[in-house]
């Protein structure tokens, strides 16, 4: 149990190091192959207005490409308010780009390491929350909107994503972090019509422990479901089913699964598929359609290279034209 907790905390340290290194790396490069970019939580927007691909993730940077093969970047696109709760230099994790009603929105996790909100089982918890920035252009700059907070200040949240449900209302779907929750959750909260803030309170969708495939050891060395929820992303199949990919761990192996809503709405109930959806050490996925109409899944590969954990973007072919999401072979642009 202690080893698993240490491993997970090292994973958070890795995210911080990736974020810090990317923020320091200001030199812009051209014609960089996708597999030469070190990036956690890659999210790709295929923008038809500009006929370009825009990739973001952890670190607050953005990359551009015309063909998915060669990329230019990194560009610093997130312009936060130093006077806000985020502080002057927040860590930025798992950024996503979402076009909506003529604008582009930057959903990301921001952490102010100078502010401590809780201590649980010896773990000091920093001020961390999902938040939304806005821009008129896909390559930014992305700036704050009206509301200074989207989620409670005393609750660590992360990996917010965007979904418009059957009621026509926009929602943020996010993780309540296991460090405080102990059994991490995925929740939803309604957004204002212009996404400038939230309405009401968050609602539980499911808990990490509901997963039939994730695993960790308890204090007695016995197997139990893992406590981590990470990287939710929503989609609708060709038959109208609402699905969600999300990531956890099988012991020390980063693993992605999928759940489906029986009601076809965010309210669920959510039924977890028995087996993971992608191979071991691939996770934090999202789905996008290429400019020529092909559906792909963007993930990062989590691997150990001589004791250093490296995360690199990878693409998989996918098909969800039927009743379920089917993940095919690796796609090489």
Predicted regions and their residues:
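Bacterial Sec-dependent N-terminal signal peptides
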Residues: 1-27
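Carbohydrate-active catalytic/glycan-binding domains of CAZyme proteins
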Residues: 21-333
């Amino acid at each position: 149990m202690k080893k698993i907790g240490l491993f997970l905390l090292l994973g958070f340290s890795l995210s911080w190091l990736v974020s810090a290194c990317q923020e320091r790396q200001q030199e812009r490069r051209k014609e960089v192959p996708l597999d030469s970019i070190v990036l956690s939580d890659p999210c790709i927007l295929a923008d038809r207005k500009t006929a370009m691909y825009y990739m973001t993730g952890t670190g607050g940077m953005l990359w551009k490409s015309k063909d998915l093969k060669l990329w230019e970047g990194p560009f610093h696109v997130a312009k936060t308010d130093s006077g806000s709760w985020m502080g002057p230099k927040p860590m930025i994790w798992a950024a996503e780009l979402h076009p909506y009603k003529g604008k582009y929105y930057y959903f990301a996790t921001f952490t102010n390491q100078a502010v401590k909100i809780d201590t649980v089982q010896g773990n000091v918890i920093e001020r961390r929350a999902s938040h939304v920035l806005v821009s008129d252009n896909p390559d930014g700059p992305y700036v704050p909107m009206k509301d200074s907070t989207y989620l409670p200040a005393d609750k660590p949240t992360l990996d917010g994503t965007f979904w418009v449900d059957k009621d026509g209302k926009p929602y943020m779907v996010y993780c309540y972090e296991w460090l405080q929750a102990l059994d991490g959750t995925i929740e939803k909260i309604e957004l204002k019509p212009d996404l400038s803030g939230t309405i009401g309170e968050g609602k539980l969708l499911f808990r990490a422990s509901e997963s039939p495939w994730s695993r960790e050891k308890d204090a007695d060395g016995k197997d139990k479901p893992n406590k981590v929820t990470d990287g939710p992303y929503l989609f609708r199949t060709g038959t109208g089913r609402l699905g969600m990919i999300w990531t956890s761990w099988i012991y020390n192996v980063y693993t992605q699964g999928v759940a489906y809503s029986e009601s076809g709405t965010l309210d669920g109930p959510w039924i977890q598929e028995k087996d993971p959806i992608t191979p071991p050490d691939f996770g934090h996925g999202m789905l996008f359609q290429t400019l020529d109409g092909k559906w792909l899944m963007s993930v990062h590969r989590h691997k150990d290279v001589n004791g250093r954990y490296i995360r690199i973007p990878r693409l998989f072919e996918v098909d969800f034209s039927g009743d379920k999401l089917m993940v095919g072979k690796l796609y090489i642009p």
